[in-house]
Amino acid sequence: MTCRSGEKADNASMKNILIAYAGALLLLIVADGLWLGLLMPQQYEDWIGPLMRESPLLLPAAAFYLLYPVGVVTFAVLPALTLESWQRSASLGALLGLIAYGTYDLSNLATLKGWPWQLTLVDMVWGAVLTAAAACAGFFAVRVWGQRND
């Protein structure tokens, strides 16, 4: 979007931020649920079974899923909306996911005995892909349902 002055319009209204958050959150929950619940549970069990709980603790899991989209929107969606570029949203999301998941996985690899390097690699790639997709979901949610300033 371009304003009459030729400058890019600010798409960071509270409504757009909440729409982007909802889009990113929904994608994160669905995609990570499929990843952890259907596609990879046996692999995680094989890699880190003794470290896993019978059932995850809901409060820390909820805290993660409520907080992470804040970072996705702040660092990947809003800058991309300013440039009107879903590709920017995807690339910033991938970078954020690589850094965030890398922080967790590389720290575990460095400090925990028996932490598998294979899990580190797979999880970092998954973090990049998941976060890129969440950023795009937030971006396109704003494009479809958000306020436009033209």
Regions found by a protein language model. Name each.
Residues 1-13:
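Short, Lys/Arg-enriched N-terminal segments with co-localized hydrophobic residues
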Residues 13-150:
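Juxtamembrane/disordered regions of integral membrane proteins
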